[in-house]
Amino acid sequence: MKTYVFIPARYGSSRLPGKPLKLINGKPMIQHVFERISKATGIEAVYVATDDDRIKEVVEKFGGNVVMTPPEAESGTDRIAQAAQALDLKEDDLIVNVQGDQPLVNQGSIEAVIAPFKAADYDGSFEMSTLSFKIVNEAEITSPKDVKLVTDVNGFALYFSRATIPHGRDYWDHDSYKHLGVYAYTKRFVDLFNTLPMGHLEDIEKLEQLRALEYGHKIKVVESEWDSPEVDLPGDIEMMEALLNAGH
């Protein structure tokens, strides 16, 4: 089982066109993500999967690897499946999917999300993992932009939602966790996932990972020590620059 990291990147964005190429402290956002991920141990290579020549040119300019994918890819997972096919990855190879709008993603998060597959007691009962982070900013608890999640006693996801979950009936004395946009799965599962029709809950919440749960597949959740906020709006860039300048 070899591990490959993919960053799906598209130029079009309704709220922030050209998002992967936006400069953060003078460096394209996609470069921040690529360089941080590349520091992780236990991975073979990092690839940007895109259908856009502008992104390809920038990535190759800073020495990154690019896999061009068809423009009709419907999602990041679909784009990654196409890239993995182009690279002739094996069924048991591990694919890590990192959203390209997380310029503060930590290498430790990459190592954490693949750890369940590398564990000595891994029995193949799950083929997908992801990350959570304990919410410290109370505004994120009620923000639909920040996806919350709950797990069972064994650390497997029960549900992901834009709503506040769990929601205390009478009082609030529990921790809440948000989902981070990092996934790991076998190539075999990625191929299977892309054959499944969109789930009802997935369509309502607009959360692709719910498709796996709706069709009965387990998702192992690992709590990360590092937050990795996403860039969605122009104002987020200033926030990222401030965090980078503060040493994040």
Swiss-Prot record:
SUPFAM superfamilies linked: Nucleotide-diphospho-sugar transferases
UniProt entry tagged with the keyword Transmembrane helix: no
Domain of life where this protein originates: Bacteria
Pathway involvement of the protein, from the record: Nucleotide-sugar biosynthesis; CMP-3-deoxy-D-manno-octulosonate biosynthesis; CMP-3-deoxy-D-manno-octulosonate from 3-deoxy-D-manno-octulosonate and CTP: step 1/1; Bacterial outer membrane biogenesis; lipopolysaccharide biosynthesis
Catalytic EC class: transferase
Enzyme Commission number: 2.7.7.38
Signal peptide interval: none
Record family assignment: Belongs to the KdsB family.
Name of the molecule in the record: 3-deoxy-manno-octulosonate cytidylyltransferase 2
